[in-house]
């Protein structure tokens, strides 16, 4: 992607996650889903990003949904993170990739397709190393990369 000038530098807070071993699998407690889930590389990025949204940026945990199911035609997909505004309208979609997966035009196209079904003001893609945020410019019907994550409204 040629948007490096708009890459957002994130300093994640120190992790304070509950991690356990069960039946040969490593599990992490997801405080949003209120259960232990398998700790995959993508889940590690998601949990750190969620922690950042709530602990650093002050996003209300009660307005964050995880793995929101949507349909693209007949295909069932899941948005990694959906942040809602105070009126419970979808406000931001976040797509998480594992740390060694580069963010690309394909990643951006994936989340834009999600936006067609679940319109939001912001789209975020992150792999925990690189993060990009786009704001939907409704009047111009285009996306603008912005230099920081917005304050929650």
Language-model segments: which ranges?
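A short, conserved, highly charged catalytic patch centered on acidic carboxylates
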Residues: 2-122, 129-153
């Amino acid at each position: 992607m040629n948007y490096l000038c708009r890459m957002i530098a994130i300093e994640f807070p120190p992790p304070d996650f509950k991690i356990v071993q069960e039946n040969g699998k490593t599990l992490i407690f997801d405080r949003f889903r209120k259960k232990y889930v398998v700790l995959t590389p993508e889940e590690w990025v998601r949990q750190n990003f969620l922690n950042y949204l709530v602990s650093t940026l002050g996003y209300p945990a009660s307005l964050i949904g995880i793995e929101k199911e949507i349909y693209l035609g007949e295909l069932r997909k899941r948005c990694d993170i959906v942040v809602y505004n105070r009126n419970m309208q979808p406000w931001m979609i976040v797509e998480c990739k594992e740390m060694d997966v580069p963010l690309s035009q394909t990643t951006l196209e994936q989340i834009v397709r999600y936006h067609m079904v679940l319109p939001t003001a912001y789209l975020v893609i992150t792999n925990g190393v690189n993060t990009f945020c786009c704001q939907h410019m409704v009047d111009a019907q285009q996306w603008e990369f912005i230099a920081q994550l917005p304050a929650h409204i």
